Amino acid sequence: MTYTISRAEQVLQTQRQALNLRWYPHYHLAARAGWINDPNGLVWFDGWYHAFYQHHPYSTQWGPMHWGHARSKDLVHWEHLPVALAPEGPEDKDGCFSGSAVVDGDTLELIYTGHKFHGDPGDEANLYQVQCLATSRDGIHFERQGMVVDTPPGMHHFRDPKVWREGDCWYMIVGAREGDTGQVRLYRSADLRQWQDAGVLDEAESTMGYMWECPDFFTLNGKRVLMFSPQGMQAAGFSNRNLFQSGYLIGEWQPGQRFIRHGEFREMDNGHDFYAPQSFSTPDGRRIVIGWLDMWESPLPEQQDGWAGMLSLPRELSLSADDRLQMRPAKEVESLRGAWFPWPVSTLNNQQTTMVDNCEAMEVNLRWDCARSSAEQYGLRFGDGLRIYMDAQQQRLVLERHYPQYGLCGTRSVPLTAGADLNLRIFFDSSSVEVFVNDGEACLSSRIYPQAPRRELALFAWSGAAALTEAGAWQLE
C-alpha cells in the first residue's frame, strides 16, 4: 500500500462516521478513528498548543505509523487537524515513529524517527531507524527535509528523538538499544540539520531494561530529570507490574559531561495504563507532561468500536523536597468543570452508599481522615468493575479493576503514610480513570470498561468505620 496524507484523511472521514461512541472519551484526546499511541511533538506555536501522536488511521491495530495532529488554546478542548506525516519514504517508508517538536524563529520543526526495513521485515538485522526532520510555517502543512541523523554502526533500535535548546546549541537525545542494554544517546547541533555525536548520556544497569524508549530531559528546581520508558524491567513486589514502565532519574548534567544520577529509577504513574510520556514548557514556564493512557499487549475492547487508545490529561510536573517527581492536573483542567454536587460528609460504618447514578465525565474530590478510620477497606466503587480504596492492613491505596469478559483484572497500589489524611482527585471519563493522590504524591491511571447502565458511584467502608471529611463531584463538560 502507498501511504499519503490525503489517503489517510479520506479513510478517517469514512471511519469516523461508523464509530461506536459508548467508550469514546468526552474530554481526553483520542484519534478521530483508528489507532493512537505515543504523544509526539508537544509544543506551543503561534498561539496554539499542538499535540501530535502516533497514529494508524487505517485500522484499530498498530500499523505503519503516521503522525496525527490536534491543537488547543487551553490543553483540554482539542481541534483535530489533518494528519501531519505519513510514511511516504524513503527514509520512513515503514513508519514515522515518535519524536518531538521545537520552534525555530517562525518555523515549527518536527524531529522524528524514520522506520524502515532493508529486506525481510521479519529479520531484525534488516531494521534501520534514522532521525528525520519536517518543517512548517503554518503549523499544519509540513515539508519533509529528510534524514538528519543516521543509525549508529551496528545498531538497529534507535528512536524517539527529543530536542531542546540550551545556550547556543540544540541538543537531541535518542533512545537506543546496545546489545541487551538500554541507553540514551546525545547529539548537538547549531542548525537542527547537521548533528554531532556527543556520546551516551546514560545507560541501563543490568536490571534497568534492554531498551529505553521515548526519552525526555529537562530541568526542575535546578535538578536534571531524565524521563524515559524502559522495556525489560522485571516486576518486584508492588513495583514494575506493567509490561513496560515509564519513570525517571534525577541528577546533574552540564554540556560536555555525562549525566550523574542522584538516586534510583522511579515509576511516574502506578496504574495499569500509562506509557511514553512527553513533556514541554508552557509560555508561563510550567512543565507539562502527557502520556499514552494504555499499555502494550493489553486488551483494548474499544477496537471493536472503530477506535483504539487515548492520551492522558495534561499534568503539571514539580519536584518535591526529597527529589520525587510530582504530577497534578494542569490548572486548565478546571475549565472543564460544570455543576458542583456536594456529598454528605459522614462516617461510614460497614456500609455502602450510592452517590451518583450515572457517572460519565466527572471529577470526584474526597478527603478521608485515616487516623479516625478503623475500617479494613474504605473508598469508592464505580459500577461492577472498579474500586479505589484504602487497604488499612497494608497501608496502601489500591486501584482494583475487574472486567473478566475483556481479560482486564488486577490491582495496582501505592504506599501511604500511616495516620495521615488521604486526599484524592479522581477523574472519570467514558473509559478511563486517573487518580491523583495527596496533591501530587502519587498517581494511578487505568482504562475501564463499564457496561451501561452500571455506571453508579458508591462510597463504602467494610469491617469498621471510615471518616469522610470532604466530598463532592464536579460534572465535567
Which residues does each PLM region occupy?
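Beta-rich accessory regions
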Residues: 9-15, 244-477
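Beta-rich carbohydrate-recognition and catalytic domains
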Residues: 1-161, 165-212, 219-270, 291-342, ...
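Repeated scaffold domains used in trafficking and secretory/extracellular systems
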Residues: 213-215, 277
